[in-house]
Every structure is written in C-alpha cells, then in structure tokens.
Amino acid sequence: MYDVIIIGAGPAGISASLYVKRANKSVLVLYSGESQLEKAHLIDNYYGFPNGISGKQLFEDGIAQAEALGVEVKKEEALHVSMNAEMRWDVATTEGSYEAGALIISTGNKKLKPNIKGIEAFEGKGVSYCAICDGFFYRKKAVAVIGSGDYALSEAADLENIVEKLTVLTNGKPAPNGCKYNVIEKKIKEIKGDERVGCVEFEDGESLEVNGVFVAEGVAGGADFAKKIGIATEGDTIKTDSHMATNVPGVFACGNVTGGLLQVCKAVYEGAEAGLSAVNFLKEK
C-alpha cells in the first residue's frame, strides 16, 4: 500500500515522485519500458546541458535520481485502474496489483492507431478505444480486439462476459502469451461496413464478420485510464486545472498526456505541481 502511485517514468512522472518522496510520502512509479524520451537522439534546449544530452541518458538519470532518494520504481505495465471499497485506487499491472490514496497519470500520449483502412471512418460507428466505456453496446454481439500485447488481453477480459463472440486480431504479430481467446494472426487490410462496422477484411482476402472493433495496440495511454474512471478528456489528452488536478478527486495528470507544449521543461514543471498537489490532497483527506 502506497500514498501515491505514479503511472509513467518520464520527466513528468519522475519529477512528481521526487516531490512526493521529499514530503515523506510513500510512492511507487510504474512504467512499461516504452519511453518517447528515450527515442530522442539529442536534447539541446533543456536547462543545464550546454552540450545537450541524449533522451536515453536523461531518462536513465531521472530514474537513478528518484531511486537514490528512495522512490520505488518498477518496470511493470499498468493495465487497469479502479477504486476499491476503501475509496483507494487499485492499479493492476502485468505482475500484480497495488493500492494508493492518490494517483498521478504521466504516461505521455501513447495511443497507437494502426495504419488500417477504415479505422478513422468508423470511429464512433463500431470502432472504439475503450472496452469498459463501450462494451455494453455490444451485448450478445461479435467483436474483435486489435492488439498483440498485455493491454489487448486486458481489453478482451473486459469484454468476454458481455459479448457473444470475441476474437483477438494481432495484425500479423505473434499472439500474446497466455491468450485464452480465439486469435487470428493475419495482417488486416481494411475495416468495412455500410453505416457501421460489418467486417474485418484480411490481406489474404478472407474476412471476419463483426459488429464492433476495439483498438488496443501497444500499451495503455493516459486517456485510456482516464475514460475508464470518469476523468474528463479532450481527444487523447486529460483535462486538468492549474494544479494538475483532474475532475476526479485524488487523480492528477502531468506531462504530454495533458497536451500543449510537448517539451521536457513543461513536463518537469507539471510533474512538480502534480506531486505537490497529490501531497496536499492526502493531507486534507
């Protein structure tokens, strides 16, 4: 059990963890291992590095700084967030489950949209990005989940007791380990239908009749968590006030997931604000 759980170990999440820990609160940082920052070859516009620094080095140094202070950092993909009977947050990961009094979402903007013809055309007409949000509309119907990782399995689990037929489509990738659902590993050519989704067509010419398609590529992004627990979003970003608080008490967001200027300096500032706000929330709780 922790005071604060932070999902995401980029500049925003790590900055938040430093302020939470310095306030003598227990904090756990979870991250999937995928970082947009690590892909940056050189960052030469951040204070204190006259010769620049690679994104990979800055990412690793940030985690090292947090761990040196006593922050617990775990490389575990967060899959699901919910509130328990004690009004605390449960975060389920690929390895287990953790509990905290406050939650900070700093995942970046990770939503992956496969390059499949028809996805955008049928958004809101059978193509969805949230099983918990929209699964109810597909009671006793046939649906497909597009994805090949643990997040796809998590979305499938949210659907299995609602829908009549469930198929995981990996779009040419190997099936995820431990998958108990019907799987098709073929490359997808197109999502087709009239006014709504009617089928998924594969590159070999065969097709699968479905009423809905749930896109769950990659790992869960901040907006994915947000929608499942009632946090206000705008597109793929989370809406916050000036103190990085969302509309759900005890949940804060910072960094790229809030939109706006996508820079390290902004992420670090918002992380500090979110960390302090989480501490103040716990004091007043």
Show the residue positions of the predicted features.
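Small-residue (primarily alanine) positions within well-ordered alpha-helices
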Residues: 16-17, 267, 274-275
